[in-house]
């Protein structure tokens, strides 16, 4: 059963401007260490950061809170599996909010899709509740 759905579309140039204007302060405030390491290792840093920013926005929407209602940017982090597939890892308040969405005796699966085509980056999140066992 789907318990959450979110999407976000962002202009990569907006992230480029934030990186130029605020630099490391912006990166440290928004992105986890894993996200920073991944993005900094790529030639197109701004596209990578933009996709991850969009994924966080989409996740906050899927959780039903948005960013302003208690879920912190760093409570959500994109991790790439060895296959390259991106997944969303939740901690702290985001994890607590996820648990509130789940019916009794269900576990969550978070599906994440990210894409970019300059100047746009986009992410979709589907939160699925599956019965345990």
UniProtKB/Swiss-Prot annotation:
Keywords: Cytoplasm, Fatty acid biosynthesis, Fatty acid metabolism, Lipid biosynthesis, Lipid metabolism, Magnesium, Metal-binding, Transferase. It is found in: Cytoplasm. Its cofactor is Mg(2+). GO terms for molecular function: holo-[acyl-carrier-protein] synthase activity; magnesium ion binding. One of its GO terms (cellular component) is cytoplasm. The keyword Iron does not apply. Its main location: cytoplasm. Gene3D superfamilies: 4'-phosphopantetheinyl transferase domain (3.90.470.20). It holds the Pfam family ACPS. It catalyses: apo-[ACP] + CoA = holo-[ACP] + adenosine 3',5'-bisphosphate + H(+). Mg(2+) binds at residues 8, 57. Its EC number is 2.7.8.7. It comes from the Bacteria. Transfers the 4'-phosphopantetheine moiety from coenzyme A to a Ser of acyl-carrier-protein. Belongs to the P-Pant transferase superfamily. AcpS family. This is Holo-[acyl-carrier-protein] synthase.
